[in-house]
Regions:
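Conserved acetyl-CoA-binding loop of GNAT-fold acetyltransferases
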Residues: 115-125
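Short amphipathic alpha-helix that is part of the acyltransferase structural core
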Residues: 1-31, 45, 126, 134
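Conserved acetyl-CoA pyrophosphate-binding loop and the N-cap/start of the following alpha-helix
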Residues: 77, 81-89
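Conserved GNAT acetyl-CoA-binding A-motif
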Residues: 94-106
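Conserved beta-strand-loop-alpha-helix junction that forms the acyl-donor binding cleft
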Residues: 103-112, 127-134
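A conserved beta-strand-loop-helix scaffold within acyl/acetyltransferase catalytic domains
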Residues: 31-49, 53-72
Length: 134
């Protein structure tokens, strides 16, 4: 099937919660509509025959910096380039909105995906945990 991608595409929180639980192995349920309305420049949805198979969120500072957040692809849809296309379309949209920098942080297992497949450059950055792990 042909994957359809849409910037600021429609989604239901329950379908995105299922995808998030599968991608990140977390049972958390969020109100994704409220989340993106309050913090996002936009997002990209990927659908295969109407089913949500991918999502990426682009949060921003309202000016020149944007961040890739929550790139997710359904397990049975992986290996088809969907994640790369999600990030590419998010990159184009952030650039079109006037952003000058697109940031991403990731677990080591995603290093090749973000650096080699998506074209990000490694940087020195810092991170401070503000809560105790669950």
């Amino acid at each position: 099937m042909t994957i359809e991608y849409e910037w600021r595409g429609t989604f239901q929180s329950d379908e995105l919660n299922r995808l998030h639980a599968e991608a990140f192995e977390t049972p958390d349920e969020w109100d994704w509509r409220a989340q993106v309305a309050g913090h996002s420049l936009g997002w990209v949805v990927a659908r295969d025959a109407g089913a949500l198979v991918g999502f990426v969120n682009v949060v921003w500072d309202g000016r020149v910096h944007a961040w890739i957040q929550d790139t997710m692809v359904a397990m049975d849809a992986r290996g088809r380039g969907i994640g790369t296309q999600l990030v590419a379309r998010a990159t184009d949209a952030a650039c079109g909105a006037g952003c000058e920098w697109l940031h991403v942080d990731f677990d080591d297992g995603l290093r090749d995906f973000y650096l080699a497949a998506c074209g990000f450059q490694p940087t020195a950055a810092g991170l401070k945990q503000l809560t105790q792990p669950r």
